[in-house]
Amino acid sequence: MTISDNQKKYMNQESIHGPDNYKPLEVVLSEAKGVWVWDVDQNKYLDMMSAYSAVSHGHAHPELVKVFRDQSETLSLTSRAFYTNTLGPYLETITKMTGFEMALPMNSGAEAVETAIKSARRWAYRSKKIEPNKAEIIVAEGNFHGRTTTIISFSSESNSKDDFGPHTPGFISVEFGSTKAVEDAITDNTAAVLFEPVQGEGGIIEPPQNWLSDVRNICDKNNVLMILDEVQSGLGRTGKLFAFEHANIRPDGLILGKALGGGFMPVSVFLSSKDVLQWMNPGSHGSTFGGNPLGSAIAKRSLELLYEEGLIENSRIMGEYFKNSLLQLNSKIIKEVRGKGLWLGVEIDPKFISGKDLSKLLLKNCLLYTSPSPRD
């Protein structure tokens, strides 16, 4: 596909005025509706990326557009220095829908992960009575939870970690999917485990069938919080409201983001019990935009639409169809198809084609899809 001068103009502007911390596909997008996206030359594409699960409702969902317009014209931001008539209804909706007692609203997924880490540490010191500054959190190799300074400290991705030190201590990394590794890492100083139920950027990697239930039992036995990061896997993406439901367990804390903002703005949250979140007193944590009226209104409506429009069940049905169709191709370039619902990953045999080259080939055929790795 030839890149037009019109598209080159926008690409050059990004290259000249911004750092090279992403490697985008060579297409300049300007419009979207539902599952379709158009570039600046009005070429039409099927969006197979969904902004890494942030646009699960489809682009410019009319119900969310209405909420966005109405709320932005009424009250968009106040800071948490005041009560609003949107935050309470949103918090009530999300806690009732998820079964957690409390929700601490933030913006980006990484912010919510940081919130979970701080909450777990404070609980460890004030409730579990771990010695000051000794709390540890067990994480998994191959994880991706964001790129803030603390989070990259326990990343396995060298490109996210190298030359950004000194790194934050207090994290113990274990093999993803290994029950024994988790058991061996537990000490009296263990505050929590922090895992993705399915590793997204790692390549849609699912753990062994009973691993999450094993981790749940280990945490119960040792008075350790089980915290799951479902920023990408949550809110219907895997054919259930949450990916952990496939394992028939419940975590002590849950991190959500991406689709929570309906594809309009960053909205995230850390959900847990009163026992954990009671220790977050005034001044301990916060964000100017966290829980803002506009984000709260959109998040509340985005949650309601999951059930009103049957999006979770549709993800299950269409995901099964899509996965089976991919498997029936019996293609020599496909090594494995992984995932559940509409969160699928196709591992490509590099002997035949690289992930980046496949993305370019799909682009020529008007399909937008790319590798989870920012370097591929």
Describe each PLM feature range:
Residues 1-33, 81:
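Active-site-adjacent loop/helix segments that line or gate small-molecule/cofactor pockets in enzymes
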Residues 28-36, 53-69, 80-92:
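A structural motif shared across PLP-dependent enzymes of the aminotransferase-like
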Residues 70-74, 275, 294-313, 327-330:
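Amphipathic alpha-helix from the class-I
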Residues 92-192:
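PLP-dependent aspartate aminotransferase-fold enzymes
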Residues 149, 240, 245-279, 291-298:
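Active-site PLP attachment segment
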Residues 205-239:
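Catalytic PLP-binding core of fold-type I/II PLP enzymes
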Residues 319-323, 332-361:
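Conserved PLP-binding catalytic core of the aspartate aminotransferase-like
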Residues 369-376:
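Conserved small/polar residues in nucleotide/adenosyl-binding loops
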